[in-house]
Regions:
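Short aromatic/hydrophobic "clamp" motif used to bind/position activated sugar donors
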Residues: 60
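Conserved donor NDP-sugar-binding/catalytic core segment of glycosyltransferases
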Residues: 72-154
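Short, acidic, metal-binding catalytic loop of nucleotide-sugar glycosyltransferases
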Residues: 1-6
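Acidic donor-binding loop at a coil-to-helix junction in glycosyltransferase catalytic cores
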Residues: 205-211
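Catalytic core of nucleotide-sugar-dependent glycosyltransferases
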Residues: 227, 240-266
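Glycine-rich, basic loop-to-helix element that forms the pyrophosphate-binding segment
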Residues: 39-55, 76, 102
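A conserved acidic beta->alpha catalytic loop
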Residues: 13-22, 40, 67
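Active-site donor/metal-binding and catalytic loop motifs
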Residues: 217-242, 252
Length: 320
């Protein structure tokens, strides 16, 4: 909605039990869309694969259901893909912290447990924090002006965003750029997506990075999509942290037994405070992740790789 280059929109209602059905129905009245409804949830990866199978365009762009697309979102992704074949696009992911108290940012209705906080807002504060359809269609700059870089609030997510985009722009030959993939703002040719088998449906978190790694192994190259802004409507509950929720890691590593996979969690944790490990073992950029993975080449096993990294970094400091 409000795109400078009209897209084909495929919406997957993956077994939702809330008012999602109504929201999709209302959207279908004002814009053309292809709708898929699942009685039972297939999970994030399964839902994305189902949507991709129904898409007819040459380029697939993935966007989460709680995320807005800026006016140049589609046109920027398409322009990037016109630069050459074999590209996987990563757009600029922002978040809207102002929506964190609302079940519906349009009306300002509170999330469960936030009733008192929302009731205490002045009319002016409520107006500043709501994100309405009118804002999206007629005055999107006001939405952008209220956003911050990163998918979630906080210094860590913002720094991660900055490091990922910096690596994509400044280190195009870095071998671990697949780790900069974004599930809520990522594009790939439909042909390449289908050829590699789509998302691994056994992985329900971090699936976008696993897909990006497979695509890169097949010869694709990660690239930044400047100007393709997405805006995550921040919510305090209902999201999963890949550092704390590590169910993805064993499946990911079984498919790709390379050191960079278990070292990703050290990279992410290095951006937090306090550190859960000695400061000398921090990994603070994707080129550093690449170097750390190279040092651990030949080490097999998730925990063995991490312990090898800790030992190697401690030894380097001791040698100095």
């Amino acid at each position: 909605m409000g795109q400078t280059e009209p897209p084909e929109v495929v919406v997957v209602n993956d077994g939702s039990t809330d008012h999602t059905d109504t929201v999709i129905g209302e959207a279908a009245e004002v814009m053309p869309l292809v709708r898929l409804d699942h009685k039972a949830s297939l999970g994030r990866s399964g839902a994305a694969n189902a949507g991709a199978s129904r898409a007819s365009g040459d380029i697939l762009i993935f966007l989460d259901g709680d995320t807005l697309a800026g006016p140049h979102f589609v046109s920027s992704h398409l322009e990037m893909h016109r630069k050459g074949p074999g590209l996987v696009g990563r757009g600029e992911t922002h978040q809207l912290r102002c929506t964190r108290f609302f079940a519906d940012p349009e009306t300002g209705s509170p999330r469960p447990g936030e009733e008192e906080r929302v009731a205490a807002m002045s009319a002016a504060e409520l107006s500043r924090m709501r994100v309405t359809l009118h804002d999206v269609v007629e005055r999107f700059q006001s939405v952008h002006d209220r956003s911050q870089p990163g998918i979630y609030p906080g210094a860590g997510p913002r720094r991660l965003f900055e490091l990922e985009m910096e690596a994509l722009r400044a280190y195009p030959d870095c071998s671990v750029l697949w780790a900069a993939a974004s599930g809520s703002n990522q594009s790939v040719s439909r042909k390449a997506f289908l050829a590699c088998g789509g998302f691994d449906e056994a992985i329900t978190i971090n699936e976008h990075r696993e897909l990006a790694l497979r695509l890169c192994k097949a010869g694709a190259r990660m690239a930044p999509v400047d100007g393709a802004f997405s805006y995550h409507l921040t919510h305090r509950t209902g999201w999963r942290d890949p550092v704390a929720d590590t169910a993805w890691e064993e499946i990911f590593y079984a498919a790709h037994p390379i050191p960079a996979v278990p070292l990703m969690s050290i990279f992410w944790a290095s951006l937090s405070d306090p550190l859960p490990f000695p400061a000398v073992s921090r990994i603070t950029s994707l080129p550093e992740l690449e170097a750390a993975a190279e040092r651990c080449r030949g080490v097999v096993g998730i925990e063995k790789v991490r312990q090898a990294h800790f030992k190697a970094t401690a030894s380097e400091i001791a040698a100095k």
